[in-house]
């Protein structure tokens, strides 16, 4: 049973234990998860706007920036095929997209603030190709990397 297995595991001399995350680490990881959810919602909203406009023959390239740039001109263009109801819908969806985009930016602001105050996270960022988002997520998930003695044990923890 489970209790027996736990007792056996504790008694083994070569058993390694994963350190418990601090409240701060859990909070940073929660902000990362929230950011990821907002990014997913933003992408879904952008794709919905693109898809609805495509049904009226209006094509917007991929990228949030393209939508932000093109939406005002599309809504003001009285010669396109958009009925009034559709214009209002697209306007509201565009406003919702702006709100979700602001939520993503706020999560990124919080992550960057934490990153700025975290020496291990800043050290990771010094490695080429690693930015504040990746560095802070890694430091928050791993914590003290010294608890992993050989590099192979760290690798097996993170796939």
Predicted regions and their residues:
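A detector of single, family-specific signature residues
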Residues: 1-159
């Amino acid at each position: 049973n489970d209790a027996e297995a736990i007792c056996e595991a504790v008694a083994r001399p070569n058993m390694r234990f994963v350190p418990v995350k601090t409240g701060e680490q859990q909070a940073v990881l929660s902000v990362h998860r929230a950011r990821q959810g907002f990014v997913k919602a933003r992408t879904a909203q952008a794709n919905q706007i693109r898809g609805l406009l495509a049904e009226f023959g209006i094509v917007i390239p991929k990228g949030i920036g393209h939508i932000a740039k093109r939406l005002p001109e599309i809504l003001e263009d009285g010669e396109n095929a958009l009925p009034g109801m559709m214009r209002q819908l697209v306007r509201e969806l565009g406003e919702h997209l702006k709100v979700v985009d602001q939520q993503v930016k706020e999560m990124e602001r919080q992550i960057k603030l934490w990153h700025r105050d975290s020496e291990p996270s800043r050290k990771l960022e010094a490695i080429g190709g690693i930015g504040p988002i990746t560095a802070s997520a890694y430091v928050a998930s791993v914590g003290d990397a010294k608890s992993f003695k050989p590099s192979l044990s760290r690798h097996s923890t993170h796939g």
